[in-house]
Amino acid sequence: MLEQPGNQTGRNSFMIDLNVLKQEIIEYSRTIGIDKIGFASAEPFTALKQRLIRQQQLHYQSGFEEPDVEKRTNPALLLDGAASIIAIALAYPAKMKKRVESKKGLRRGFFCRASWGLDYHEILKDRLTKLEEFIRAKVPGVKVKSMRDTGELYDRAVAERAGIGWSGKNCAIITPEFGSYVYLGEMITNLPFEPDEPIENMCGDCTKCLEACPTGALVQGGQLNAKRCISYWTQTKGFVPDEIREKIGNRLYGCDSCQTACPKNKGIDFHLHPEMEPEPELAKPLLKPLLHVSNREFKKKFGNMAGAWRGKRPIQRNAIIALAHFKDDTALDDLIGLLKDPRPEIRGTAAWALGKIGGKEAEEALKAASGKETDWEVLREIENGLAMLRK
């Protein structure tokens, strides 16, 4: 039984049985589409703090995450009186029920599984909001703060502490039920719930994820150099390094290699939430139409996907890389037209792609562009393209 007295600010007091409330929360979570829930203490993540500091020293972080290590590892800085954290997980599909139409010569790219269906940030927000409302109704005056991977806390560490799963060598939370195909969210609260036990790490001696990583971004089990991760580069704006381009293939957003290689994901494919179901033509879109899509068309078609958060520019650049990967000579006219695009990274990547695909037409276009181009990075790409054609 917990009694929280009122204080000088006039906050209402309340008395509740936390064990009963915890069970009520667990049962309610099942009715609103939360697939797994766990409870953890809100003590600082001391070991994690040292690892994150080391990551910063090595320049291994992506830059998309919260830069303040203290905020990432100390829940008390995010909520006054933080006593525990409720962690949730939602399972997402690993396979598409419907297949895309396959026609010879029509090349496609693909979005990673975590980007299928409705943006998972919105789905998690919906579930956490409902959970908040339930707890507030049970405990008037309670303090809570919810977040997803865009928040301050390191969600994988929270999920691990709360017994959702273990932290795999592929830097993902692996659950016994759903593998690593789960979205994570958490809620800090001033209610001191009894914490759940963490799950034993079951990776063992397996290193399949490390071996499957196309760029060697998994430095060692549980340590990622985001600056080498394909998923990171598909989300950046600007030029992609040559060595990464060669590994991207036809990925438009994200990379699943370290997940599909994991034995714990073998046979895993849950379709529990209709809003997560992928639309085949969005998950695996045709490449050439992407080159000419307008901002309005892109937002209308892809705007509800998590993979659209950086806008159309990275997706278009990645589509160019994918066409080069396929050496699709039917795209030559499209790529030659992009040599006049106002965006340097699009012009430059198109020049590189023309060099990869090859042919007299590509060579003539690159030579003509070299006499007009003024951007030094684009000029470098044009020279690289011409050098490939001379081989």
Segments the model singles out, each with a brief description of its role:
Residues 312, 342-343, 374-375:
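Short inter-helical turns and helix N-cap capping residues of alpha-solenoid HEAT/ARM repeat scaffolds
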Residues 297-302, 328-340, 359-371, 391:
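Amphipathic alpha-helical scaffolding segments comprising HEAT/armadillo-like alpha-solenoid repeats
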Residues 316-328, 347-359, 379-391:
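Structural detector for internal amphipathic alpha-helices that build alpha-solenoid repeat scaffolds
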Residues 14-202:
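Auxiliary alpha/beta "docking" domains used to position bulky ligands
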Residues 208-231, 248-275:
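Iron-sulfur cluster-binding cysteine motifs and their immediate structural context
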Residues 4-5:
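Cationic, low-complexity basic patches in intrinsically disordered or flexible, solvent-exposed regions
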